[in-house]
């Protein structure tokens, strides 16, 4: 990558600053909506909190944001970019060659990030709409929680419904809206603290440590489950690195952190001033003058929608990366926006909608959702820490230092995990079950791919070159197609799957002018689009290796058209002049793509466990995108052929012929 690109990635700009606010900080920026409310309610209400409890809580929030978000993610993780892309799967691609078992933390981290992300739209939008309870004139309507639920569901239906059309048209307002949001957090928080400037003593970590062991803290270490809500968006910050660049995050994070901390301090000051008032409203909304609350709710709802949109888009990207890493089933992907970064996966969109809606209906209030929120993301952070340790070692950090630094973060995050574990019985089990289901699917898909690689036989193409030439010239067979294209997951040097040669020569001899053998390899770089060609010493057999980035669409026909033109222009491939055509000068014949589906046979080579893996993978395939759609072949001529997975050493079953009685008597 050139220095100019590196500079562009690392430098900041005014426009990049605003864009970063709209894309990166939606989740962490809406945490003030519910974090203090969770702390106060779990302590027994505003009447039950003391000054030392409030100081300790704010201190815990400040130092959690500092240690996890600022130091681990902004200062360390952002340096672990894979060609300017971030996130747990990008990090995995950087270190996967260091140890084969690293696929495990990558799968677990990706699954928990997806499952917790399904809860984010529910908790943020519900929290924002519940703010209407504090608005004079509307409070009598929204005191009925059913009205809150209905309004929330309507917003979610619209939000998930517009995904298919692309969100670029509304994405332009995300940055300015979030700038107003963060500015409001900072300004309102600052004015609320003016009457209680002692709240800024919370910057001293003494108050954080004191609260953890204080008898005033009714929940003990489990208070960290609520504190962790303040930093759940840190992982999303790293995942969105590629959208805005490292420099813009470096510049925007201090502003965001200052505004968030001021908001928490302002809410804390309001609690101290009203702890004997008996008010049980959400401190976030209650700390604002009543005449401004309707505007605040509107702004909070917009911020919640933006945060939800960021999580939805992030989920699409995460699943897309997992599919191209061959650890997730293939689902149909469309690109409704103007660039490749705006993708849409219908199945994932509606699964997220179903999970989010069920969460709203099952938990009903944001307080109940908060009780379940954050458990899975602690696991994601632990998995990221494991991968980061290997990255630091790979980049030359002394192993002892890498182990010590990451052990510190792992210890902190493990404590948060233990503190959040109590959430399992308060609804966290739903998120854990969803995460386990995703991990199971990933494991089945990955293990099934490895089994296929283990058993499928390969043959040397050179050994069958003469037979293919004879078939090509044999006019006794009708021309099957001018160009026959085979897509193969496995192709190394001149070795190709036995099933492909079986299809050409045995199953039904396929006479063609040119035989294409195409292998798509996903690279660690996100936007690679390169190819390599081997003519196998002929002008009628072409081996093509397509190297596509993990964020590139694998639409093979589009790439193949370019490759054909390049080969003809260079003289390596004869022109295929057409006698009958409506396109003057057309010199490329027709194409037929042959897809070979491998199914488990009854041969005995597979163990019972391997057979379970393959049968389960086959069942999952029924609800996934067909290879035809995945490779962009829906408008091409395609033949699907089924072959058994095991093609060697099939044992003969003993059987005897029954001789007719009259023949035996003769």
Curated annotation (Swiss-Prot):
Subcellular location: Cell membrane
Lineage, highest ranks first: Bacteria, Bacillati, Bacillota, Bacilli, Lactobacillales
Name listed for the protein in its UniProt record: Probable potassium transport system protein Kup
Cellular component annotations (GO), alphabetically ordered: plasma membrane
Annotated TM spans: 16-36, 58-78, 100-120, 141-161, 165-185, 221-241, 253-273, 294-314, 343-363, 373-393, 399-419, 424-444
Keyword Isomerase attached: no
Reactions catalysed: K(+)(in) + H(+)(in) = K(+)(out) + H(+)(out)
Membrane topology value: Multi-pass membrane protein
Keywords: Cell membrane, Ion transport, Membrane, Potassium, Potassium transport, Symport, Transmembrane, Transmembrane helix, Transport
Primary role: Transport of potassium into the cell. Likely operates as a K(+):H(+) symporter.
Gene: kup
Primary site of residence: membrane
Record-level Gene Ontology MF annotations: potassium ion transmembrane transporter activity; symporter activity
Family membership: Belongs to the HAK/KUP transporter (TC 2.A.72) family.
InterPro entries recorded: K+_transporter, K_trans_C, K_trans_N, Kup
Organism: Streptococcus pyogenes serotype M49 (strain NZ131)
A matching Pfam family: K_trans_C
């Amino acid at each position: 990558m050139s220095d100019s690109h590196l500079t562009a990635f690392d430098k900041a700009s005014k426009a990049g600053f605003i864009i970063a606010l709209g894309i990166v900080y939606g989740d962490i920026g809406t945490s003030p909506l519910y974090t203090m409310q969770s702390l106060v309610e779990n302590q027994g209400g505003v009447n039950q909190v003391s000054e030392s409890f409030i100081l300790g809580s704010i201190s815990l929030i400040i130092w959690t944001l500092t240690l996890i978000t600022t130091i681990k993610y902004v200062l360390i993780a952002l340096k672990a970019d894979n060609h300017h892309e971030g996130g747990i799967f990008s990090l995995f691609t950087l270190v996967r060659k260091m140890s084969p078992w690293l696929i495990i933390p990558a799968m677990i981290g990706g699954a928990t990030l997806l499952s917790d992300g399904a809860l984010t739209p529910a908790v943020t939008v519900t929290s924002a709409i519940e703010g209407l309870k504090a608005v004079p004139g509307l409070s009598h309507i929204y005191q009925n929680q059913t009205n809150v639920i209905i309004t929330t569901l309507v917003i979610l239906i619209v939000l998930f419904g517009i995904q298919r059309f692309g969100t670029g048209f509304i994405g332009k307002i995300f940055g300015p809206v979030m700038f107003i949001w963060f500015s409001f957090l900072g300004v309102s928080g600052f004015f609320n603290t003016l009457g209680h400037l002692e709240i800024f003593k919370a910057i001293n970590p003494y108050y954080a440590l004191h609260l953890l062991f204080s008898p005033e803290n009714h929940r003990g270490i489990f208070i960290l489950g609520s504190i962790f809500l303040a930093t759940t968006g840190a992982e999303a910050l790293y995942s969105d690195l590629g959208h805005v660049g490292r420099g813009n995050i470096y510049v925007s994070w201090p502003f965001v952190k200052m505004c968030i901390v001021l908001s928490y301090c302002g809410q804390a000051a309001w609690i101290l001033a009203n702890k004997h008032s008996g008010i049980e409203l959400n401190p976030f909304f209650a700390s604002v003058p009543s005449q401004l609350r309707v505007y605040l709710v509107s702004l909070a709802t917009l911020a919640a929608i933006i945060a939800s949109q960021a999580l939805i888009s992030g989920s699409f990207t995460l699943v897309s990366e997992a599919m191209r890493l061959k650890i997730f089933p293939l689902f149909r992907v469309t690109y409704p926006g103007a660039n490749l970064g705006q993708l849409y996966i219908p199945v994932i969109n509606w699964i997220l909608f179903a999970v989010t809606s069920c969460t709203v209906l099952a938990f009903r209030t944001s307080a109940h959702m908060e009780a379940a929120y954050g458990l899975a993301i602690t696991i994601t952070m632990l998995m990221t820490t494991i991968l980061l340790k290997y990255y630091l070692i790979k980049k030359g950090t002394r192993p002892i230092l890498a182990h010590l630094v990451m052990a510190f973060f792992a210890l902190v995050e493990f404590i948060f995990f233990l503190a959040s574990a109590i959430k399992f019985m308060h609804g966290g089990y739903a998120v854990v079950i969803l995460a386990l289901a995703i991990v199971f699917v990933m494991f089945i898909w990955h293990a099934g791919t490895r089994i296929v690689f283990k058993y499928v036989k390969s043959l040397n193409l050179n050994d069958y070159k003469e037979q293919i030439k004879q078939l090509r010239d044999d006019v006794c067979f009708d021309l099957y197609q001018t160009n026959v294209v085979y897509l193969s997951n496995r192709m190394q040097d001149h070795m190709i799957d036995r099933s492909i040669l079986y299809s050409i020569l045995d199953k039904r001899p396929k006479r063609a002018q040119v035989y294409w053998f195409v292998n798509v390899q996903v690279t660690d770089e996100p936007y690679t689009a390169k190819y390599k060609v081997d003519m196998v010493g002929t002008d009628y057999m072409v081996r093509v290796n397509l190297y596509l980035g993990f964020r590139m669409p694998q639409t093979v026909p589009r790439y193949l058209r370019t490759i054909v033109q390049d080969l003809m222009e260079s003289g390596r491939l004869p022109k295929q002049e057409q006698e009958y055509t409506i396109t003057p000068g057309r010199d490329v014949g027709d194409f037929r793509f042959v897809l070979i589906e491998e199914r488990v046979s009854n041969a005995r080579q597979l163990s019972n466990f391997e057979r379970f893996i393959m049968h389960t993978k086959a069942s999952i395939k029924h609800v996934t995108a067909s290879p035809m759609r995945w490779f962009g072949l829906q408008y091409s001529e395609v033949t699907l052929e089924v072959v058994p997975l095991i093609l060697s050493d099939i044992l003969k079953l003993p059987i005897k012929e029954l001789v007719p009685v009259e023949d035996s008597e003769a």
